[in-house]
């Protein structure tokens, strides 16, 4: 990876207008993707605001995720606390799953190098993050968010017992334009029989960087110019070649390739930093819809086999759409440099 350039090096110091900042292409070794930074196409970093309305909250009486309406949901997998009618969170099957958990016996057919179809076996679950309809994830305290993260871990460990599953994606869609069909705060997990191509590309990119430098590029991503905040065990950064404006990554300080190795103490610590980032995003960007994704490693590869990669949590505020150029090339245009994002977000005060 090319060494991150500072604002002063690219003619975009604090005193320069956006129009005077030169465009720049950066390649991200993690995603293996080129990004065009073109500040002249946009406004000042501090002027970014969401114009997308959150999806309207239905009345609690019509929401099956609210406490007391459990019978309207798909089957429950577990709740926290266990067997408690006054639950704090529930993990349930998705009522409209993208994959079927009932096809496992058919999924044992061997996949060959020429296979173009395999049976659609997998798991698609929903994590209901609060019993109260009006509470969003950023309203929950760090311990409560830690409980949600540990619920992800517990469910990953359960699903990992199925030999046909190779990768599990944890993700959250907050707001209608971010893909949420329910306004009650929730996240989702999808367990796949294949390793998705973006995951393979991420592993290849981080491996190439490691072989070239002897270092993990995600460990290297924590340069001070890109750091927003940090906790005891995690650091939040605006990544060097951010695909999206105001994209944020939360990275463990210790090298770790699999999210489900997270312990209880680190879960609470991560919960605090995730809460802080969501609160800062909401304040600075006018409470935009957002997605977060946990990027981890395939289940069947051990920690010792992956000295070159690192799990992380990616937050993407929905501030701009994807056009024909991005779809056609896989190369994205970002109107704000991550150094500027980091500076703006560091200075956001919640008091």
From Swiss-Prot:
UniProt keyword Metal-binding, yes or no: yes
CDD domains recorded: GalT
Active-site residues from the entry: 186
GO biological process: carbohydrate metabolic process; galactose metabolic process; glucose metabolic process; positive regulation of cellular response to phosphate starvation
Positions of Zn(2+) 2 binding: 216, 219, 255, 310
Cofactor remark from the record: Binds 2 zinc ions per subunit.
Stretches the record annotates as Disordered: 1-63
Keyword Nucleotidyltransferase: yes
One MF term in the entry's GO annotations: nucleotidyltransferase activity
EC number(s) on file: 2.7.7.-
Cofactor field: Zn(2+)
Annotated binding of Zn(2+) 1, by residue: 63, 66, 133, 184
Binding annotation for ADP-alpha-D-glucose: 41-44, 72-74, 94, 173, 179-182, 188, 321, 325-326
InterPro entries: ADP-glucose_phosphorylase (IPR053177), GalP_UDPtransf1 (IPR001937), GalP_Utransf_C (IPR005850), GalP_Utransf_N (IPR005849), HIT-like_sf (IPR036265)
Family: Belongs to the galactose-1-phosphate uridylyltransferase type 1 family.
Family annotation (PANTHER family): ADP-GLUCOSE PHOSPHORYLASE
Quaternary state and interactors: Homodimer.
Record's miscellaneous remark: Functions by a double-displacement chemical mechanism and ping-pong kinetics through a covalent nucleotidyl-enzyme intermediate.
Summary of the function given for this chain in its UniProt record: Catalyzes the conversion of ADP-glucose and inorganic phosphate (Pi) into glucose-1-phosphate and ADP. Does not possess galactose-1-phosphate uridylyltransferase activity.
Protein name as it appears in the record: ADP-glucose phosphorylase
């Amino acid at each position: 990876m090319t060494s991150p350039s500072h604002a002063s090096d690219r003619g975009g110091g604090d005193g320069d207008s956006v129009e005077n900042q030169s465009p720049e292409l950066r390649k991200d070794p993690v995603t293996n993707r080129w990004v065009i930074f073109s500040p002249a196409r946009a406004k000042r970093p501090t002027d970014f605001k969401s114009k997308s309305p959150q999806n309207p909250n239905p009345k609690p009486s019509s929401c099956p995720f609210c406490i007391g309406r459990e019978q309207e949901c798909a089957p429950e997998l577990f709740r926290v606390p266990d067997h408690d009618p006054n639950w704090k969170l529930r993990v349930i099957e998705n009522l409209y799953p993208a994959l079927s958990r009932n096809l496992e016996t058919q999924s044992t057919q061997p996949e060959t190098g020429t296979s173009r179809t395999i049976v659609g076996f997998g798991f698609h679950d929903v994590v209901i993050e609060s019993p109260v309809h009006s509470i969003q994830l950023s309203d929950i305290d760090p311990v409560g968010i830690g409980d949600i993260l540990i619920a992800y871990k517990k469910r990953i460990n359960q699903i990992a017992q199925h030999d046909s599953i190779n990768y599990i994606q944890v993700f959250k869609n907050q707001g209608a334009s971010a893909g949420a069909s329910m306004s009650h705060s929730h996240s989702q997990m999808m367990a796949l029989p294949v390793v998705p191509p973006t995951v393979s590309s991420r592993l290849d990119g981080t491996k190439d960087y490691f072989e070239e430098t002897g270092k993990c590029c995600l460990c290297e991503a924590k340069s001070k110019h890109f750091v927003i905040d940090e906790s005891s065990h995690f650091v939040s950064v605006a990544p060097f070649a951010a695909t999206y404006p105001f994209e944020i990554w939360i990275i463990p300080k210790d090298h770790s390739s699999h999210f489900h190795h997270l312990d209880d103490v680190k879960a609470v610590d991560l919960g605090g930093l995730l809460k802080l980032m969501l609160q800062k995003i909401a304040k600075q960007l006018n409470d935009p819809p957002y997605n977060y994704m946990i990027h981890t490693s395939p289940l069947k590869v051990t920690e010792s086999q992956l000295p070159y990669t690192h799990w992380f949590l990616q937050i993407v505020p929905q501030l701009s759409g994807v056009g024909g150029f991005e779809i056609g090339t896989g190369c994205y245009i970002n109107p704000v440099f991550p150094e500027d994002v980091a500076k703006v977000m560091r200075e956001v005060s919640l008091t």
